[in-house]
């Protein structure tokens, strides 16, 4: 997984590509590289570590009209200079950058080795450029050789290629992996992420799966399918801003994005709610008739959002909800009943496992598919029957904060909309719920401005934490435990509070930190019972509870109080508490908050 960035135009390509790579670094950051042409010959520079290392290695005297670059998150071959992209052929005449996994790379590699090709890396990517180079030597036809190469690849990929015989041309292609073109005046950008070139262009074309593009200086983009049939593509121009890439005085993107949550909530509520009901635009054109079950499919944090949605929607809309991990869904031959609705959740809209699950849904049933994502230009948004956007703006921190809580809010609103459509919720209860959610932005600001940021973990030297919650709080505990793993590198596990006695209580010893979420009023006393169980075994209990439940201090070692709220808003506020706790513990442990080891923001490979 990685970020791809390329430039072709009248300006100096090298600093533009280095700048673009810096903006893509959150997608992969174990190594980086750039390729360009200097005096008619290919020039390639690579560096292990952040893009700043690459910038230091590249001379500022290099001027070129074309360049391609890459930030890497290793999937084939360890992080190293020789495995970093761009990769070149044996003659160093062409260079290629690639995102994805080539599933038949071993077979292709053996075929090329039999023809005398010597490989210089452990990656599947090098197979592509060596295969292309062999074909180009035979045909001397740049575009035909590229098409022929692409058709031999199995797997998911996006790539960009340059050849020293054609200094005015860049080639790029996409197959089940994102690639976006930005169009300026006599210039074009190639990127894995639209935000990397928005400073220069808001006019875009997105390569669909199975498409390649030929870019030439001063000429319009030529788009083809892999059989070289010409495709006419529309240019989409959007309002664009770079504000999201500015930390705005915060030390970390994660902290900035934590504080942006109230504004995100306000945007969602403005688009979906009015008075005591819903706006006409919310789910406009998407019928909720005859839906008899929901299948929610997602990965990571989005899966936890779906898990909460199951609890909420079943309780308020009286409809069965099944939640699936996307990476498992496609392999287990699930039964999809008639009149089911599939809901696929992905922040980026490019999560490979989730897109694969979408393909599986299409094969298994005629169920309609609703998408929930953050990126309008994404593959998910283009392939589902209807898409709800979480309006979170660019999220740079690898550990999701505002995107996750935006998913929660939108899913809760979807549950209320469904309950109202099915006439299983009293109008008074609906009005109270909507008002409770409308209170959420101000309650979030109140909490973010409270003493929560003074909290420090007294058990920071412990290597294992347990999270407990019941009902709505259990999925939120799952997310809190994930956050601790992601950025503090601490082993953390979440359990339903009632399950402790069925096994996990064996892990409790004196001083074991147990973080208990006591935010669901309907099971508050039951949750207190779980606290008593672990306290009897001398666990160290950190209790999170509403402000009105200060009696929790009598049975816990530490307390974090959350503003009182409506039952449907509470999971979101308790989520934010978990985000702040994980952030604080990461600082205490000295880990990298925005770029945790081994993780990438957008998981575009299976």
UniProtKB/Swiss-Prot annotation:
Give the main EC class: transferase
Asked if RNA-binding is a keyword of the record, the answer is: no
Gene behind this protein: glmS
Q: What are the alphabetically sorted keywords of the record?
A: Aminotransferase, Cytoplasm, Glutamine amidotransferase, Repeat, Transferase
Quaternary arrangement and interactors, per the entry? Answer: Homodimer.
HAMAP family tied to this protein: GlmS
Domain (SIS) spans 278-424, 448-596
Active site: residue positions: 2 (nucleophile), 601 (for fru-6p isomerization activity)
Record-level GO BP terms: carbohydrate metabolic process; fructose 6-phosphate metabolic process; protein N-linked glycosylation; UDP-N-acetylglucosamine metabolic process
Query: Glutamine amidotransferase type-2 domain: which residues?
Result: 2-218
> What is the official name of this protein in its record?
Glutamine--fructose-6-phosphate aminotransferase [isomerizing]
* Function according to Swiss-Prot or TrEMBL: Catalyzes the first step in hexosamine metabolism, converting fructose-6P into glucosamine-6P using glutamine as a nitrogen source.
Give the location in the cell. Answer: Cytoplasm
Q: What is its EC number?
A: 2.6.1.16
PROSITE patterns in the record: GATASE_TYPE_2, SIS
Main subcellular location: cytoplasm
Q: Which GO terms describe its cellular component?
A: cytosol
Is Cytoplasm among the key words of this record?
yes
| Reactions accelerated catalytically | D-fructose 6-phosphate + L-glutamine = D-glucosamine 6-phosphate + L-glutamate
Looking up InterPro entries in the UniProt record yields:
GATase_2_dom (IPR017932), GFAT (IPR005855), GFAT_N (IPR047084), GlmS/AgaS_SIS (IPR035466), GlmS/FrlB_SIS (IPR035490), Ntn_hydrolases_N (IPR029055), SIS_dom (IPR001347), SIS_dom_sf (IPR046348)
The scientific name of the source species is: Chlamydia trachomatis serovar D (strain ATCC VR-885 / DSM 19411 / UW-3/Cx)
Pfam entry (one): SIS
Give an example GO molecular function: carbohydrate derivative binding
